[in-house]
Swiss-Prot record:
Gene3D superfamilies: Transcription elongation factor, GreA/GreB, C-terminal domain (3.10.50.30), Transcription elongation factor, GreA/GreB, N-terminal domain (1.10.287.180)
Pfam family, one: GreA_GreB_N
InterPro entries tied to this protein: GreA/GreB_C_sf (IPR036953), TF_GreA/GreB_CS (IPR018151), Tscrpt_elong_fac_GreA (IPR006359), Tscrpt_elong_fac_GreA/B (IPR028624), Tscrpt_elong_fac_GreA/B_C (IPR001437), Tscrpt_elong_fac_GreA/B_fam (IPR023459), Tscrpt_elong_fac_GreA/B_N (IPR022691), Tscrpt_elong_fac_GreA/B_N_sf (IPR036805)
Family: Belongs to the GreA/GreB family.
Any single GO BP term: regulation of DNA-templated transcription elongation
PROSITE patterns linked: GREAB_1, GREAB_2
Gene: greA
Protein name, as recorded: Transcription elongation factor GreA
Regions annotated as coiled coil: 1-72
PANTHER family, per the entry: TRANSCRIPTION ELONGATION FACTOR GREA
Function: Necessary for efficient RNA polymerase transcription elongation past template-encoded arresting sites. The arresting sites in DNA have the property of trapping a certain fraction of elongating RNA polymerases that pass through, resulting in locked ternary complexes. Cleavage of the nascent transcript by cleavage factors such as GreA or GreB allows the resumption of elongation from the new 3'terminus. GreA releases sequences of 2 to 3 nucleotides.
Domain of life: Bacteria
One term of GO molecular function: DNA binding
Keywords: Coiled coil, DNA-binding, Transcription, Transcription regulation
Length: 160
């Protein structure tokens, strides 16, 4: 079975690589040191510091594994390869819900770079799926768990 690929910009991949380096060179050694200190407290069966450190170690190792997979199977997307006004990973899109006045701006990213609070939506999200491949002036229907709504694409530009 073919491994899943993770479409992303080169910048997103570089960010993941830095995050992985931080986990391996800083967080992992810190956790190992905390485990060592907690072990020195004696009886491990009632040692909450040891349990907490082991839990954190499992979390950090899970993050490392996840990042390594995303980096290994990264598919670098070149937003210059699509039309200038076409929605793709690496593009900034301004949309407006039909019948509303407010405009919304999103940056389309691969799933590894999604950050809703920063306005970065994944190409796999309902918004991303509805917008990918559309062009300035097109309308799109965004399907959500609570219903659907139509938006007009006002502007598409390369993300700075």
């Amino acid at each position: 079975m073919a491994e899943k690929t993770y479409p992303m910009t080169l910048e997103e991949k570089e960010k993941l690589e830095k995050e992985l380096e931080e986990l391996k060179l800083v967080r992992r050694p810190e956790v190992v040191e905390r485990i060592k200190i907690a072990r020195s407290y004696g009886d491990l069966s009632e040692n909450s510091e040891y349990e907490a450190a082991k839990d954190e170690q499992a979390f950090v190792e899970g993050q490392i594994s996840s990042l390594e997979t995303k980096i290994r199977y990264a598919e670098i997307v070149n937003s210059d390869a699509v039309a200038q006004d076409e929605v793709a990973i690496g593009k900034t899109v301004t949309i407006q819900e039909i019948g509303e006045d407010e405009e919304e701006v999103y940056i389309i990213v691969g799933s590894a770079g999604a950050d809703a609070f920063a306005g970065k939506v994944s190409n796999e999200s309902p918004i991303g799926q509805a917008l990918i491949g559309k062009k300035t002036g097109d309308t799109a229907t965004i399907e959500t768990p609570v219903g659907s709504y139509d938006v007009k694409i006002l502007k598409v530009e390369k993300t700075a």
